[in-house]
Amino acid sequence: MKTLLLTLVVVTIVCLDLGYTLKCNKLVPLFYKTCPAGKNLCYKMFMVATPKVPVKRGCIDVCPKNSLLVKYVCCNTDRCN
């Protein structure tokens, strides 16, 4: 009985995700990853020539500046990219 109770407690802790962690989409939005500590933004990177097709997605600490060839879109909520 104690083993069952301990197992339930562990499963509950894992499912509740103690401490806030940001989740960002990977390149294919069906999949996401949990961001490590310190990376509190999600980003989506586009080539300026093809703005509708993201090239890269993930977690980042500071939103990079856009350039003539590359545009970044950053946000700070779960799976916002």
UniProtKB/Swiss-Prot annotation:
Coiled coil: none annotated. Expressed by the venom gland. One of its GO terms (biological process) is killing of cells of another organism. Residues 1-21 form the signal peptide. One of its GO terms (cellular component) is other organism cell membrane. It is found in: Secreted; Target cell membrane. Its main location: secreted. GO terms for molecular function: toxin activity. InterPro entries: Cytotoxin_Cobra, Snake_3FTx, Snake_toxin-like_sf, Snake_toxin_con_site, Toxin_cobra-type. Disulfide bonds join C24-C42, C35-C59, C63-C74, C75-C80. Pfam families: Toxin_cobra-type (PF21947). Keywords: Cardiotoxin, Cytolysis, Disulfide bond, Membrane, Secreted, Signal, Target cell membrane, Target membrane, Toxin. Shows cytolytic activity on many different cells by forming pore in lipid membranes. In vivo, increases heart rate or kills the animal by cardiac arrest. In addition, it binds to heparin with high affinity, interacts with Kv channel-interacting protein 1 (KCNIP1) in a calcium-independent manner, and binds to integrin alpha-V/beta-3 (ITGAV/ITGB3) with moderate affinity. Belongs to the three-finger toxin family. Short-chain subfamily. Type IA cytotoxin sub-subfamily. Monomer in solution; Homodimer and oligomer in the presence of negatively charged lipids forming a pore with a size ranging between 20 and 30 Angstroms. This is Cytotoxin 3a.
